[in-house]
Regions:
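Alpha-to-beta junction loops
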Residues: 38-48, 92, 115, 137-140, ...
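A bilobed periplasmic-binding-protein/Venus flytrap-type ligand-binding module shared by bacterial periplasmic
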Residues: 74-85, 185-200
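A conserved helix-loop-strand patch within extracytoplasmic ligand-binding domains
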Residues: 67-117, 214
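Periplasmic-binding protein-like
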Residues: 104-111, 208-229
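Short, polar/charged alpha-helical segment
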Residues: 1-23
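Ligand-binding "clamshell"
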Residues: 55-67, 82, 155, 160, ...
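Short helix-initiation/N-cap motifs at beta->coil->alpha
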Residues: 24-35, 122-151
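Pocket-flanking alpha-helical
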Residues: 30-61, 77, 83, 168-170
Length: 256
């Protein structure tokens, strides 16, 4: 996946120049990478956003720490039958992922756009249709399996699509008319808390924060949501701090 490619194509060469041996291990689930990290089978993992890590380590009593952000394929609003945000019309149809966490992200995005208005006290992680206070454009939100969103674009006016499914279906992230502006769900690299201040860990963090990696990532992963400290706005985004909710694009972890 993309996080594995970042290691192979940029991070590994940077660290090897400093004398490290880097071994990449790829996982196909969201549980093993944190357990392997906690147990010492790997030294770093890169696959998850902070809310997922926070809940996982609390549930499993693991002493892990998020150490650096990585470019992440974001949730985006893509054209369907209509090609621009200005073309939105009364009764427009918008498809969105049907799982609760990603549906909440979609609602937050539509709220950001001003197409709907959510209740003032809504928890953005848990927003549902019941939290829509106003719908001045009579937007019809069509819920469907996240994996089916890309190919159903021709059936709706706009589609809210997860970055990983957009990429796997051949869509370009740069086609998005709007990306969620929140940095709450950019993915992080995680370390064992006891290791964070060690020389090797600081060198790994330094590699991900280096100008060399930034230059590579901006060229190789166009349209991604980049680390907040890079200060690069998302497509059509205003940089809101409203939270959104989980999607992990792919799994990869690097060990020294």
């Amino acid at each position: 996946g993309d996080f594995g490619d970042m290691v192979k194509e940029s991070i590994k060469p940077i660290l090897e120049k400093q004398g490290y041996k880097v071994t990449l291990t790829e996982f196909s689930d969201y549980v093993t990478p944190n357990q392997a990290l906690a147990e010492g089978a790997i030294d770093v993992n890169v696959f998850q956003h902070k809310p997922y890590l926070d809940s996982f380590k609390a549930e499993h009593k693991l002493d892990l720490t998020e150490a650096f952000q990585v470019p992440t394929a974001p949730l985006g609003l893509y054209p369907g039958k209509l090609a621009s945000l200005d073309a939105v019309k009364d009764g427009a149809t918008v498809s969105a992922p049907n799982d609760p966490s990603n549906f909440a992200r979609a609602l937050v995005m539509l709220n950001e756009l001003g197409w709907i208005k959510l209740k003032a006290d809504v928890d953005p992680l848990k927003a549902s249709k019941a939290d829509i206070a106003e719908n001045p454009k009579n937007i019809k939100i069509v819920e469907m399996e996240a994996a089916n969103l890309p190919r159903s674009r021709q059936d709706v006016d706009f589609a809210v699509v997860n970055g990983n499914y957009a990429i796997s279906s051949g869509m370009k992230l740069t086609e998005a008319l709007y990306q969620e502006p929140s940095y709450a769900y950019v993915n992080w690299g995680a370390l064992r808390t006891a290791d964070v201040k060690s020389k090797w860990a600081q060198d790994v963090i330094g590699a991900y924060k280096s100008d060399e990696f930034k230059k590579y990532a901006l060229e190789r992963f166009k349209g991604y949501k980049y680390p907040a400290e890079w200060n690069i706005p998302a497509a059509g985004a205003s940089g809101s701090s409203a939270a959104s909710a989980p999607v992990a694009a792919s799994q990869a972890s690097a060990s020294k």
